[in-house]
Regions:
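Surface-exposed beta-strand edges and their flanking turn/coil or helix-capping segments
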Residues: 36-39, 54
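Alpha-helix N-cap/helix-start positions at coil->helix boundaries
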Residues: 32-37, 78
């Protein structure tokens, strides 16, 4: 439904740049990132149809550039940014932008807020394992197949901060800060927790899980919710606590950003955006739970996506990628529509035979049968 509505809007705007400007003016401050993201996508797709005049394209690009890239209220939504950047780059490629146009502002990073806040156990427990919490914090499909893959290329190090620290370095840094204000009781609880966890390798963790959970509970009680949340995010062996996709498990290699922290942040952010079991639980439960069909989307899934797009934008702006990882890879994985492509299906159902080539069924190569020795000779030819 959402994709169909987006492309229907592309069709409406394809020859109406003035309507695109009017719609943007009316809805640009709407407090719903899901709507504004697709409005920008539709405007971008409409421009890409190539039917706007040079002046029309310029004024639309200028408006979005001023509101999204030159504004102090730049949206922390990685897809909204991507569509808007595409629109300005398209206008630039068409030669409609003046020489003094600040097109450099469209290039990331954009300076969103960092770091994300620590999320306490008390806050997660207050959600009572509702749909959002199960889906994100407790190894649900969204966490494992969407969230983890969207953020697992990022390290724990800020941009321009020098070499990426190891997980062991981060734990030591946290401990040094902890020692400044920790009481003897806090330090004793921390030592007891480390003693239990040092016995737990990846293979024995689940065997020792009851002892580890008991030591964690004692440490949490001793240090309080906020310090325990900081320890969980910055110093714990977080990858042992769930089924994380593509996680780096070595403490002496460049530290990956804590995926458990990312999951918890998305969970809280989705609730902060407005989702609740009381308001939306019954409706969401009535929607078929199938990640491969998209006829109607659960409201909770909408808020999860908004939170994830915000997290990805903030990580892209502020963190170094892990060695060998590509910063552009994240946005490629998250793109979910090509707003310029209006064809929904073709005549080809997989069974029909077409006499003439078309743009979706290219001509078949005419390969004449040849003897085996001729084929082998052809393999060694260096020319077409």
């Amino acid at each position: 439904v959402r994709d169909t509505a987006t492309k229907a809007l592309v069709v409406l705007l394809a020859s109406r740049p003035e309507l695109a400007s009017a719609l943007w003016l009316r809805f640009k401050n709407l407090d719903d990132a899901y709507v504004t993201e697709r409005l920008v996508a539709a405007i971008y797709g409409a421009a890409m149809q190539g039917r706007w005049s040079a002046n029309g394209l310029f004024f639309v690009a200028k408006d979005l550039h001023a509101d999204l890239f030159a504004s102090v209220d730049f949206p922390a939504n990685i897809l909204t940014r991507d569509h808007a950047r595409g629109l300005v780059r398209y206008a630039e490629s068409q030669g409609v932008l003046p020489e003094d146009f600040d097109s450099y502002l469209i290039n990331p990073p954009y300076g969103s807020a960092w770091p994300i806040e620590h999320i306490t156990e008390e806050k997660i427990e207050s959600y009572e394992r509702d749909e959002i919490t199960r889906s994100t914090v407790f190894d649900g499909d969204f966490a494992r197949y969407q969230l983890d893959y969207a953020v697992n290329d990022w390290s724990a190090a800020a941009k321009l901060s020098g070499p990426i620290p190891t997980a062991r370095d981060l734990a030591q840094r946290w401990f040094d800060t902890f020692c400044i204000t920790a009481s003897p009781e806090m330090l004793a609880a921390h030592r007891a927790l480390l003693a239990v966890m040092s016995e737990a390798s990846n293979d024995s963790y689940w065997t020792l899980r009851p002892l580890i959970d008991k030591a964690k509970a004692a440490f949490r009680a001793a240090v309080g919710e906020q310090v325990f949340a900081q320890w969980s995010a910055e110093a714990s062996n977080w990858y042992q606590t769930g089924m994380f996709q593509g996680a780096v498990h070595l403490r002496d290699e460049p530290a990956q950003f804590n995926l458990a922290w990312a999951r918890r942040w998305v969970c809280k952010r989705a609730h902060d955006l407005g989702w609740s079991e009381a308001l939306h639980g019954d409706f969401d439960a009535s929607i078929r739970n199938d990640r491969h069909t998209h006829a109607v989307e659960r409201i909770g899934k909408k808020y999860q996506w908004i939170a994830l797009y915000e997290l990805c934008a903030r990580m892209t702006d502020n963190l170094q990628p892990l060695p060998g990882r590509d910063e552009a890879g994240d946005i490629m994985r998250l793109r979910n529509i090509d707003p310029s492509l209006l064809v929904t299906q073709t005549e080809d159902d997989g069974w029909r035979r077409f006499e003439e080539a078309s743009f979706w069924v290219p001509p078949e190569p005419d390969l004449k049968p040849v003897a085996a020795d001729q084929a082998l000779d052809w393999l060694n030819v260096n020319q077409d």
